[in-house]
């Protein structure tokens, strides 16, 4: 039973004119050892940033896209790739300003035969900031999530920095899982910057870094995911924070990461009205085109379940829906400009 998963998380967030670093985490959740040429693909807008480095040498490098092979990925094994960019300054020909949104897309193959293809692709939208707290927590899905995703996983990145003047021998990251908001039994640790022991006591989770010996100014992080309670309703919000203990010092409290479940028609999502979807109705294939580079094309049923995802890196794409039954579907297209969601009928 092959079953792969991939996530993109910020190590150093995007700031205009500065270097940003992202972590691609991929994991084998199945029971087979897996290998795949060009198995990991990562897309970004190269008009808005310049690639600086990758921690693993790419197999392929094209404008706005990077590919890697992976080999002998063992069951339950997790690996990571770090990617660094220089983000454009506000004075650049293609400027990047505070509150702009940068989109990063990662996929892992094979999607064919995978037990759960919904986590073979991850789209991370990051709001550009002017500064950041080195000890913080962030929900990667954002501040606003569709009500259709109630009961699904939310991903959290907890970052910490030794701001003291001496080496930190032991660090503990402690976070409470509110049983009204989350299902603690679903919590999974996806990745950490250093070797860690995890401990759960009641609704409190501790990530214990023993003998980490983190130098002054050194950074670390924890990436986890947990399902929101399926009893939540539209308009409800979930909150998460953490306390970080450096040796015997008073804990450093992070911010509170708040996520609200409300319709995606809110102003946080810019629309790309140039996108066209045709023919409609259709019997098999759907053409998608627009004025801006397309990133992903996703097909949903009327219950809001994701049925199909296709990567794109051009201003046009074709998605084949012939395997699905006749009826009404929704197609969500994400481009460099924004998002467009439309209804399509298969005859």
Model-derived features with residue positions:
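Low-complexity, intrinsically disordered segments enriched in Ser/Thr together with acidic residues
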Residues: 69-98, 208-234
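Short beta-strand edge segments in extracellular beta-sheet folds
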Residues: 127, 258-262, 343-347
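Enriched for extracellular/lumenal, surface-exposed ectodomains of secreted and cell-surface proteins
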Residues: 85-89, 101-117, 241-248
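C-terminal outer-membrane/trafficking sorting elements
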Residues: 270-278, 282-347
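Short, acidic/polar linear motifs in exposed loop/turn regions
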Residues: 29-32, 89, 162-166, 230-232, ...
